[in-house]
Amino acid sequence: MSADEKKGHGQRSERGRGPGGPGTQPRIPLASPAAWLVLIALAIFLFRAFQDVGVRRIPYSQFKEMVRQSAFERVVIGPDWVRGVPKPVEAGAAQGGGAQPQQQAQGEGERNGQALPYVATRIPGGGDDLVQAVEKAGVPYDAVAGGGMGDLFWVWIAPIAIGLLFWAWVMRRMSGQLGQGPPGVMAFGKSRARIHMEPDTGVTFQDAAGIDEAVEELQEIVEFLKTPEKYRRLGGRIPKGVLLVGPPGTGKTLLARATAGEAGVPFFSLSGSEFVEMFVGVGAARVRDLFAQATQKAPCIVFIDELDALGKSRNAGIMGGHDEREQTLNQLLAEMDGFDARAGLIIMGATNRPEILDPALLRPGRFDRQVLVDRPDKRGREQILRIHARNVKLGPDVDLRSVAARTPGFAGADLANVVNEAALLAARRNKNHVTRAEFEEAIERVVAGLEKKSRRINEREKEIVAFHEAGHALVSWMLPFADRVSKVSIIPRGLGALGYTLQLPLEDRYLLTRSELRDRMAGLMGGRVAEEEVFGEPSTGASNDLQHATAVARMMVRDYGMSPALGPVSLGDQNGPSFLGVKGFETRSYSDHTALAVDREVQALVEEAQDRARTVVREHRERLEALAARLLTIEVVEEDEITRLWGPKVVRPGTIEGRGHEESPPETPNRPVAASADASAGFGRSGPQPPQALARHAGGDPDPES
C-alpha cells in the first residue's frame, strides 16, 4: 500500500464512526434533543403571540355593561373567561350608551367586515351575577366546562414532552458520545477509543531514547504489521498481546504511540478506567464494541493504558474489586481468545502494577510478551536529554553528559522536567542561553524541592541545622562505603526541610553489600549524633533520619538475611515487584517470638550505626565545626570546598578516589528521586530497584516544631 493510499485510509477512518461505519450520511440536525427543545420553545412563543389575534380583549366591567345593553348576539361562558359575539350593526345605527362599543367593533375591531368577538377575564368564585344579567337581557348563552384541547396540551402534553426531551439530552451528554459516534441513551455501550493514525501520532522509535531493549522487542511487532508473510512462511505466530510494564514516567505510552507510528496502522488508544462507569454491563459492552471496531480496521494496534484499572486480579484477597469490573475483565479475556492473530490485530497494554493483574490475563495466548520499560542508565539519560534539549538554546558551559551523570534514577518524564525547569529559570533571569547554573538549580529543585526564601528561622535553629547537616556530611565522608557528598545546604526547601545534604553518584549500581548498608545507616544517624555532641540533646529534625535508618535495618534483618541471630532467612512478604514503591497490605507469616527477635535485631543495628557515627564525630570534631561555621556564613557548600576543608573522601581500597556509589532506597519512593528526608538505603522487596539520587534533610517532617 502506498503512502497516499495509507493517508487516504487514515482520512476515511477519521470520519463518523456510527453504526453504518465510514461513509454514513450525517445526522439530520432535527434529530437532536436540543433542536427539539428549541422548536417547542419557538412553538410556545408563536402560540402565545397569535393567541389573541382573532379576538378583542376588554375589561370585565365593560363586558357586563355591554351584556346589560344587549350588545351581544350570543355569549359563551368558560371557567375563567367569557366571550361575546357582537350583534351586526347597520350603518349609522347607534343607541344610547352602547354606541361607543359598537363603533369600536365596526372600526378597529373589524375583520373581513365582521366585528371581532369580545373576550374578558371572568372573576373566579361566587358572587358573580353574569348569568342573571345574560338571562335578563335575553341573550342566548352557552357554557364550557373545561379548558378544551388547548388546556390539555399546555397542562399535560407539553410539560411531559419537554421533560422527556430534556432527559434524553442529559443522558446523551452523560454517555459522552457527542461527536464520537451514534448519539442517544443507548450509546453507553459504545467504545470511547480514539483512533490515531500515523500522521496523528507523530512519534517514531527515534523519539523513544534510552529504552533500546524495549524498542528491539517491539520492532518485531512493527515488521509483522508491515510484512506478515515473513513470519507466516515459517509457521511463526506473532504475539496477540504485548504488556509494557515499568515505573511511572519511563515512556510506556510514548513507546506504544511510536510502535503505531512506525507501522503506519490505525492506533486505538484508551484508558482501562474508561470501560467501567455507572451502569452495570457497560464495560462488557464497550469491550465488545472496541474489538468490533478494531477488527474492521485491522491490521491495527489497540492500546489500553493503565490496564490494572481493568485487569485487577479476581482474587478475593485483593480489595477494591466488584462484579462490574469482573464482568468487564471476563469479556476482555473472551475477546482476546476469540480474535484471529492472523488478522493483524495487536493488543498493547501498559501498567506500573503488574503484580495485581489477573493471572488469566498474563497467560500465553493473551498477553504473550511482557516488555520492561525501566529507568534509563547514564547513556540512556544522555540520549533523552539531547532529545528534550533539541529546541533549547544551550550555553557553551552545558555538558549534557555531566547532567546525565548527576541524575541517576531519573525517568524520562523527570529529565524532560529538568530541561523545562532549566529553560524557565533562564527565561526568568532574562538570559539568552540556558547555562549550567540553571541545570544544577533544576536538578536541585527536583531532588530537594523549591527554595523557601520566605521561611525565616532564628539563629539558634539555624545553628542546629548547620551542625545537623555537617554531621551527615562528616560521617558519610569518613566512612569508606558511604556515598560521596555533592552539596550541603541550610537553605529551607520543600515542605519541611530546613537543610539538606545532597549525594549524587557518578555511576549506576544495583547491588548493596552489608558493609554499604551499615555505612549508609551510620550516615543517616550522623545528624542526630552531631546535635547530641554539640548541644547535648537531639531535636525533632532527626525524626525522618530515624525512620529511614529503622527501615534499612528492618529490611536487613527481615528480607536480606543479614542478621547473625536469625540467620539466612527471609521473613518478608513477597508479592512481586512494585514499580510504584509503595507497600500494600502486609501479612505476617511468623510467630510473635520471631517478631520480637526481629525488633531486637533492628534496634541493635540502629544503635550500632549510632555508635559508629558518634565515634566519627568525636574523632573529627574540628572538621565538623569548620563545616558548620562555613555553612552559617555562606549557607551552601559544594563538594570542592568540602575537599579543601577536610581533604579527599575516605574510600575503600581498590577504588578511584572520590568516585561515588549509588544504591537504591529500601522502598522506591513515588518520585524518581529521594525528595523526602534521608531516603537512603537498601533495595526493593523483590530485588534491586533503580538507583536514586540521595538528599538528606534536616526537619524532614512538615511539622512546625521541626
Swiss-Prot record:
UniProt EC number:
3.4.24.-
The cofactor binding remark recorded in the entry reads: Binds 1 zinc ion per subunit.
Membrane topology (Periplasmic): 51-150
The active site lies at E469
Compositional bias, Basic and acidic residues, is annotated for 1-17
User: What GO cellular-component annotations does this UniProt entry give?
Assistant: plasma membrane
- Required co-factors: Zn(2+)
- First-listed, main subcellular location of the protein, grouped into a coarse class: membrane
What subcellular compartments does it reside in? Cell inner membrane
Q: Annotated Gene Ontology MF terms?
A: ATP binding; ATP hydrolysis activity; ATP-dependent peptidase activity; metalloendopeptidase activity; zinc ion binding
Q: Which PROSITE patterns does the UniProt record give?
A: AAA (PS00674)
Q: Which UniProt keywords apply?
A: ATP-binding, Cell inner membrane, Cell membrane, Hydrolase, Membrane, Metal-binding, Metalloprotease, Nucleotide-binding, Protease, Transmembrane, Transmembrane helix, Zinc
**Cross-referenced Pfam families:** AAA, AAA_lid_3, FtsH_ext, Peptidase_M41
Kindly list the positions annotated as binding Zn(2+). Answer: H468, H472, D545
Q: How does it assemble?
A: Homohexamer.
Family affiliation? In the central section; belongs to the AAA ATPase family. In the C-terminal section; belongs to the peptidase M41 family.
Q: What NCBIfam families does this protein map onto?
A: FtsH_fam (TIGR01241)
| Descriptive protein name | ATP-dependent zinc metalloprotease FtsH
Report the source organism: Anaeromyxobacter dehalogenans (strain 2CP-1 / ATCC BAA-258)
Originating gene: ftsH
